[in-house]
Amino acid sequence: MNKNSPTEFEMTATAEYPKFEFVSTRIVRHRQIAKDTWQMTVESESLASRTLPGQFFMVRIAGLNDPLIGRALAMFDMHCDSFGKPSAISVVYTVKGKFTQVLSRCVAGDEVELWGPLGNAFPTEPVDHLILVAGGVGQTPMLTLASAALGKRTFGNAAPPARSSPAGYAKRVSLCYGARTKEYLAGLPEFQSTCSDVHIATEDGSLGHRGRVTDLLTSLLNEPTQGTRRIACCGPEPMMHAVSELAKQYNTPCDVSLETPMACGIGICFTCVAKVIQPDGEWDYKRTCIEGPIFPAESICWE
């Protein structure tokens, strides 16, 4: 085996814990794409061919013992080789804390370790208008979701057939993306070339609407209804709570991608639990890394 080739080990699934792969590979591209925000691309044919929109990986820097645990990062993009075969994945992160500070100093050729794909994926039921709502770094899982929904690309071809994404299930995909200032907006060119329409809000008015991303969502929800609608949301918890309330007000299904801190990513440590309302009206703790990170918005105990 070429010493620069990824090393991959597949972990056996059980009734309680999912199948995932441990991959030791190298960074092929690492660049800053917004203020305090980086996009890292790593080579892995297996992860690129199996991962669905909304799923994530635990990431570690090889040989780094401080911090020891990995960091959960969602797939931002999937890349193909010259033959059109999935060959690499990208993650996006903001520099916040010791791990991401060290990670941001890594360069192409440095070794990293990933295990995944982890968690569930966004629903793929046919819909006329899919509205993506992202705040902060919450845009990360939205690019592949938009691509899959519009049928521009399929994902998870090597995953079990029941889990792979269908070839297009939305007629229109809108992105509502909010940030503090325009300097924090990441991946805009990719979203503008993928989504049907992109709507921007910045708190200081430096780009797009001056205000909150929920203002943009309200405007879209007030458009004359043309068929079915669904919302997918990721970002700070107060924003997702507000989006959940709007979805309820407009009787629109909404899925949220939770960003709870986690240590293992495979359901063992229970550090990522969230309060989820059960069918009987009571709540119970659910692991974001196993039962999530995607949940129906109305099932989350926001208070």
Region spans (language model):
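N-terminal acidic, proline/glycine-rich, low-complexity intrinsically disordered segments
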Residues: 1-6
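Ferredoxin-reductase
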Residues: 9-108, 179-180
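Local cysteine-cluster metal-coordination motifs and their immediate loop/turn environment
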Residues: 141, 237-238, 260-294
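Short, charged beta-turn/beta-strand-edge "cap" motif at the junction between a beta-strand
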Residues: 62-66, 116-121, 278
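A charged, well-structured terminal subsegment
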Residues: 295-303
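FNR/FR-type flavoprotein reductase catalytic core
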Residues: 98-261
